């Protein structure tokens, strides 16, 4: 009987990518197939996030829920990976003795060996080392089911923002060799992928030799240009970038590479220079706005999303007002906004924080309401327009409809005959937007672009 693996993913798109690789590794080595129900699984993995305390505690809550499955089936393997694993290490096993594996983001390729050792020794296996970029040399070829795919181009972060745990859990910035990245993307294109999202904690820090042993270095702008030349790739996205390293070369790429979408996620974190300095972000509000101004001079239709932290230690009402001023000025398409969560081991965790939680909550609610108003305003402005979308899949709520995304990352659902679904998935189509909902759009099919073959499923 075929054995199965269940993976629950917390956090960022890097973790989503890593979770897919866990399935690929175990599929290639052990013949496991993915299941969406933990009750059916022979291996249960939690790919964790430690950016906020709430996400970290959710992991232990979920571990408690699968404990009964372990008691009913002692052969069940339970593993904890990701950033919580890197941070907590063997203490996870001390807190939850039924956990069999603890592994970091850089050691997921060792999962088959860790499972074997666990079965042989009867002891929990912990491997949270940082073996540079080794994991990419041991991963099987990427497998995809759809026209969009994530591709990790680098690991780690070297910025050491005062509030952030990522450099401690994922290590310093290490870029994948250029030819490795391009080979993976070319392989994905051969499988019908039309859109790639280049992933990293700080993608615009990418630096890699043009060829093995080469002294000539390719930066992130060059990488994008090379990706755009790969046959079959029609759209390029990336996340996440850092304002400090948003170079003029990268800005110029928006003029040179039409396949680079007019959507950018550029975390600002705050709108007060005083708070940005305390966060050790390395730029001012004016410098951030300068980047956006230059980009919008090239792409007036640029859609912008960001990350914002409310209630950082010492944040005053004046600081928050400056954040709101920036939000209004930038006209963000969306944002990921949260109340500051102190992370153990980071410098900011030692800062005095005397702002009452109810004040932080009020500020967050005001911020999010303002962003939502802007999101709806942008969506409403799209009604009546023709948008080119990449058809990705059947719509989740209605199997008679298809779904895809616009350049500015809006999900569009539109009716299409079921008999046409296989042909349309993976195609670029023009859709007229007829209605705007809070988190999606509804459209009508206008034109199918036949410049590339449909994906095979």
UniProtKB/Swiss-Prot annotation:
Output the InterPro entries linked to this UniProt entry: Elp3/MiaA/NifB-like_rSAM, Methylthiotransferase, Methylthiotransferase_CS, Methylthiotransferase_N, Methylthiotransferase_N_sf, MiaB_methiolase, rSAM, rSAM_horseshoe
Q: Tell me the ranges covered by the Radical SAM core domain, including all copies.
A: 143-377
Which positions are annotated as binding [4Fe-4S] cluster 2?
157, 161, 164
EC numbers on record: 2.8.4.3
Domain TRAM stretches: 380-447
Cofactor binding mode and count: Binds 2 [4Fe-4S] clusters. One cluster is coordinated with 3 cysteines and an exchangeable S-adenosyl-L-methionine.
Name the major location.
cytoplasm
Limits of the MTTase N-terminal domain: 3-120
Show the GO MF annotations. 4 iron, 4 sulfur cluster binding; metal ion binding; N6-isopentenyladenosine methylthiotransferase activity
- Give residues annotated as binding [4Fe-4S] cluster 1: 12, 49, 83
The record's subcellular location field reads: Cytoplasm
Spell out the reaction equation it catalyses: N(6)-dimethylallyladenosine(37) in tRNA + (sulfur carrier)-SH + AH2 + 2 S-adenosyl-L-methionine = 2-methylsulfanyl-N(6)-dimethylallyladenosine(37) in tRNA + (sulfur carrier)-H + 5'-deoxyadenosine + L-methionine + A + S-adenosyl-L-homocysteine + 2 H(+)
Keywords in UniProt for this one? 4Fe-4S, Cytoplasm, Iron, Iron-sulfur, Metal-binding, S-adenosyl-L-methionine, Transferase, tRNA processing
Q: Which family does it belong to?
A: Belongs to the methylthiotransferase family. MiaB subfamily.
What task does this protein carry out?
Answer: Catalyzes the methylthiolation of N6-(dimethylallyl)adenosine (i(6)A), leading to the formation of 2-methylthio-N6-(dimethylallyl)adenosine (ms(2)i(6)A) at position 37 in tRNAs that read codons beginning with uridine.
Subunit annotation: Monomer.
Q: Which NCBIfam families match?
A: miaB-methiolase, MiaB/RimO family radical SAM methylthiotransferase
Q: What is this protein called?
A: tRNA-2-methylthio-N(6)-dimethylallyladenosine synthase
User: What species is given as this protein's source?
Assistant: Paraburkholderia xenovorans (strain LB400)
Give the gene name: miaB
